[in-house]
Amino acid sequence: MQTEKPDPSTDPGRGRRLGLDVGTVRIGVAISDPDCILATPVETIQATADDADVQRVVEICRDNFVVEIVVGLPVALRGNHTQSTLNAEEFARLVKEELPDIPVRMVDERMSTMAATHAFHASGVNSKKGRKKIDQAAAVHILQGWLDTRRRALS
């Protein structure tokens, strides 16, 4: 899958967006307000071998009337794909199968977890104690980047 940029011709309009930071252990989840101004953390989902993690994302989307899903695509700093890239793409594919009417966008998430970790360290939160929160913060970082880029693309 290729990373995407917001495109006015395919934008679903007003409504909540869901941001996902997909990891092998945890999945950080963030959501926007309906006007797409601010991303806020929702929860951290435990990654599972069965589809319980996918089903939880589906439930969050349905409960919040999500109109678009933004999944962070972890690529190496040099731009090459890794096993984490493949895992995120597979997770996005499974979500798309469950929610075929909701666009699922892949965005470059390089440095999102690092940015979230640095922010937590700067605020005095230990990364070991705050791992679940860091995953949520990374999802917020991914989604907020999409919202900000979307706003510029639509104006």
UniProtKB/Swiss-Prot annotation:
SUPFAM superfamilies, per the entry: Ribonuclease H-like (SSF53098)
Cystine connections: none
InterPro entries: RNaseH-like_sf, YqgF, YqgF/RNaseH-like_dom, YqgF/RNaseH-like_dom_sf
Keyword Amino-acid biosynthesis: no
Subcellular location: Cytoplasm
GO molecular function, one term: nuclease activity
Main location: cytoplasm
Keyword Nuclease part of the UniProt annotation: yes
GO cellular component, one term: cytosol
GO BP, sorted A to Z: rRNA 5'-end processing
UniProt keyword list: Cytoplasm, Hydrolase, Nuclease, Ribosome biogenesis
Family: Belongs to the YqgF nuclease family.
Function: Could be a nuclease involved in processing of the 5'-end of pre-16S rRNA.
The protein's name in its UniProt record: Putative pre-16S rRNA nuclease
Gene source species: Corynebacterium jeikeium (strain K411)
